[in-house]
């Protein structure tokens, strides 16, 4: 089976910014890819927090130019929340794939075995994250949109304008 492809339709400051299409490495990280895929479709319904297990309407709360764009906290919206389809947190599946350059999709965490729903898209090679964060996909279309998101970021991670996943889902 080919790897699934999912999308984010993004807005920046309330204006449509375009679509990011990501291939998920279900062949290498099946559990991590499935978590992200299901959070894109929203098919699992509400989570333990009572909020839908869905990226739709969530924001990229932390954007650092020449590093990464982080999102996926659909419970608190500020980097303190998020929830996986497996319950609150799940284990690091493996570290087979590396942070090789722009467009790499990886799980944000707060230490070993603390994966939830937060993720980041690299805007450069981040090899120091290898073995600490699970790489589970890559951007295949829309790196121009990622670059636009990067432009509203700052060294502190705070965004100058809201960056929102207006819609999301699965393409294949």
From Swiss-Prot:
InterPro entries: Cyclophilin-like_dom_sf (IPR029000), Cyclophilin-type_PPIase (IPR024936), Cyclophilin-type_PPIase_CS (IPR020892), Cyclophilin-type_PPIase_dom (IPR002130). Keywords: Cell membrane, Chaperone, Isomerase, Membrane, Nucleus, Rotamase, Stress response. Induction: Induced by salt (NaCl), osmotic stress (mannitol) and abscisic acid (ABA). GO terms for cellular component: cytoplasm; nucleus; plasma membrane. Disruption phenotype: Decreased salt tolerance. Mainly expressed in stems, leaves and cotyledons, and, to a lower extent, in roots. Pfam families: Pro_isomerase. It is an enzyme of class 5 (isomerase). Its main location: membrane. Its EC number is 5.2.1.8. Residues 7-170 form the PPIase cyclophilin-type domain. One of its GO terms (molecular function) is peptidyl-prolyl cis-trans isomerase activity. It comes from the Eukaryota. Binds cyclosporin A (CsA). CsA mediates some of its effects via an inhibitory action on PPIase. It catalyses: [protein]-peptidylproline (omega=180) = [protein]-peptidylproline (omega=0). The cv. Suxie No.1 (SX1) is more tolerant to salt stress than the cv. Tianlong No.1 (TL1). Belongs to the cyclophilin-type PPIase family. Interacts with HAL3a and HAL3b in the plasma membrane and nucleus. This is Peptidyl-prolyl cis-trans isomerase 2. It comes from Glycine max. The lineage of its organism: Eukaryota, Viridiplantae, Streptophyta, Embryophyta, Tracheophyta. The gene is CYP2.
């Amino acid at each position: 089976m080919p790897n699934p492809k999912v999308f984010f339709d993004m807005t920046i400051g309330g204006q449509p910014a375009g679509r990011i299409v990501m291939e998920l490495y279900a062949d290498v990280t099946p559990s991590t890819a499935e978590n992200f895929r299901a959070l894109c479709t929203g098919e699992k319904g509400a989570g333990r927090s009572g909020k839908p297990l869905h990226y739709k309407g969530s924001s990229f709360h932390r954007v650092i130019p020449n590093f990464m764009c982080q999102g996926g906290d659909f419970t608190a919206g500020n980097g303190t929340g998020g929830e996986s389809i497996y319950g609150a947190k799940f284990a690091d599946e493996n570290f087979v794939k590396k942070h090789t350059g722009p467009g790499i999709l990886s799980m944000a965490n707060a230490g070993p075995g603390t994966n939830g729903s937060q993720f980041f898209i690299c805007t450069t090679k981040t090899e120091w994250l290898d073995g600490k964060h699970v790489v589970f996909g890559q951007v295949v279309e829309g790196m121009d949109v990622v670059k636009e998101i990067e432009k509203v970021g700052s060294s502190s991670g705070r965004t100058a304008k809201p960056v929102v996943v207006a819609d999301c889902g699965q393409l294949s």
